[in-house]
Amino acid sequence: MDDLRDTLMAYGCIAIRAGDFNGLNDFLEQECGTRLHVAWPERCFIQLRSRSALGPFVGKMGTVCSQGAYVCCQEYLHPFGFVEGPGFMRYQLIVLIGQRGGIYCYDDLRDCIYELAPTMKDFLRHGFRHCDHFHTMRDYQRPMVQYDDYWNAVMLYRGDVESLSAEVTKRGYASYSIDDPFDECPDTHFAFWTHNTEVMKFKETSFSVVRAGGSIQTMELMIRTVPRITCYHQLLGALGHEVPERKEFLVRQYVLVDTFGVVYGYDPAMDAVYRLAEDVVMFTCVMGKKGHRNHRFSGRREAIVRLEKTPTCQHPKKTPDPMIMFDEDDDDELSLPRNVMTHEEAESRLYDAITENLMHCVKLVTTDSPLATHLWPQELQALCDSPALSLCTDDVEGVRQKLRARTGSLHHFELSYRFHDEDPETYMGFLWDIPSCDRCVRRRRFKVCDVGRRHIIPGAANGMPPLTPPHAYMNN
């Protein structure tokens, strides 16, 4: 649809039928083939399709839409079209709406779902910015930092981690302001690493379970990350906030690159490793957003072997009125100039982001969410030891006992501290090993994670509510 009003009306018709899937399908049959503009990217469209006109996805519809395995709240979903644009195959990205109005995208190639927005109104603002796949494609990449010779040199090496590390060592410290148009990244700066504390001292927050208010040594950082990454990797830099007057960089997450060129973040407040980007170029486009709020949902094994952060639930407790998408109260919000934060405001924002993540993980465990099984044992132990646990719950001891009940023996992880290398499957071997394939690394990660877990599957994770009309069509 070329007319903006007609496009908005079409989105509105979809939104108001979120609770009536049969009515929604009737509308889609009438509008089948219609192309709707999206907020981002500009050259992409959603081609509306009914549930019987989605090609190979029809055979997967029951699993994806009705079994609740792909989203945190086991929400019923309904497809309403596929993404059409440069670089995409037909039916590769299927767009769905949840029974409570959330907008999702199923990636057929990667067998995962991205939660694009909690409401249709938010989707009209953000488009597909929360779908990682777009940020891996050159046509849609928009960096959040200003490229210079340093970045260009680093991006040339891709999977050559040794040369990349040598380049960072040679050039030394450099910081870059993060320009996030939607203000979703809690960090204000990214900085390349340096050991020279006279140039800049990397300092952790008081929430850190590693070095509260201090600085971690590079080798200790590697020792903590290698049981998760399980292959050769190097330190690239850090995300957080730079305070030039004090020559300090307040770290929210350290940034590492493995031998395959994948970028990870190490969170010292959670003793956790999160996948940030598929490569350095994608990292410049998303920075620390995936290490703050991850929108990718997938099965437990896939989430663990990819080191995906547990996704943040955006579902409102009460289904919002779909008609709010026509409100104009904040349409000009994004056009206003953003205020430059003071150091105090920037530091407070980092602490708020860290606290939010801690509270999110505690809630997963206390509510027996299926996503709690995605947490690594080190994360559970870090929650037990966290100085911020009292901010997350009133029953600190009760929560601590529940966290410990989920944590198995950490002896398997302690091998890395003792530097035992008699067994090729120890972490000292992982640190220097350059495996021949990604499959070996994935196998190691899943094995290592489950060794340290206890009571992997909570009671609530095994069952799903029975299918009831209008969802019965999924079995047909």
Curated annotation (Swiss-Prot):
Query: Which Pfam families does this one have?
Result: US22 (PF02393)
What UniProt keywords are attached to this protein's entry?
Host-virus interaction, Inhibition of host caspases by virus, Modulation of host cell apoptosis by virus
Q: What does this protein do?
A: Plays a role in the inhibition of apoptosis by interacting with the pro-domain of pro-caspase-8/CASP8 and thus preventing its activation.
Subunit structure as annotated in this protein's UniProt entry:
Interacts with host pro-caspase-8/CASP8; this interaction inhibits CASP8 activation.
Statement: the UniProt record of this protein carries the keyword Aminoacyl-tRNA synthetase: no
User: Which GO biological-process labels does this protein carry?
Assistant: symbiont-mediated suppression of host apoptosis
> Its family?
Belongs to the herpesviridae US22 family.
Name of protein = Viral inhibitor of caspase-8-induced apoptosis
- Report the GO terms under cellular component: viral tegument
